[in-house]
Amino acid sequence: MDTVRVAFLLVLVLAVSLGQADKDENRMEMQEKTEQGKSYLDFAENLLLQKLEELEAKLLEEDSEESRNSRQKRCIGEGVPCDENDPRCCSGLVCLKPTLHGIWYKSYYCYKK
């Protein structure tokens, strides 16, 4: 019986000591993986930030182009006063001095060609 007890105690001590070593080893592996994961997350975060900045720059550029285009589309309709030096009449209209009924206004108006 004593040999069985001694053998059992020996196996128990070996299992506990090896198990403890495995636990420490597992803890070290987990720490390494966590550190690698953090560096990977930092890299992914920086990459995403760069892509977002590029996208934002493109959107701002498109907005400024749209603003320029919308300013070009603005025009003055028919029968509306216009400036002789800077006519902004819509296409198909010309900035002319009014005849007869509008002479007293001393202004130019957009009329059909």
UniProtKB/Swiss-Prot annotation:
Gene Ontology MF, one: sodium channel inhibitor activity
A single GO cellular-component term on record: extracellular region
Keywords: Disulfide bond, Ion channel impairing toxin, Knottin, Secreted, Signal, Toxin
Position of the signal peptide: 1-21
TM stretches of this protein: none
Propeptide: 22-74
Basic and acidic residues composition-biased segments: 60-69
InterPro entries assigned: Toxin_22 (IPR012627)
Tissue and organ expression note: Expressed by the venom gland.
Pfam families per record: Toxin_22 (PF08092)
Region described as Disordered: spans on this chain: 60-83
Disulfide cross-links: C75-C90, C82-C95, C89-C110
Claim: Calcium is one of the keywords in the record: no
Family of this protein: Belongs to the neurotoxin 14 (magi-1) family. 01 (HNTX-16) subfamily.
UniProt domain comment: The presence of a 'disulfide through disulfide knot' structurally defines this protein as a knottin.
The protein's role, per its UniProt record: Probable ion channel inhibitor.
Protein name, entry field: U11-theraphotoxin-Hhn1a
Species whose genome carries this gene: Cyriopagopus hainanus
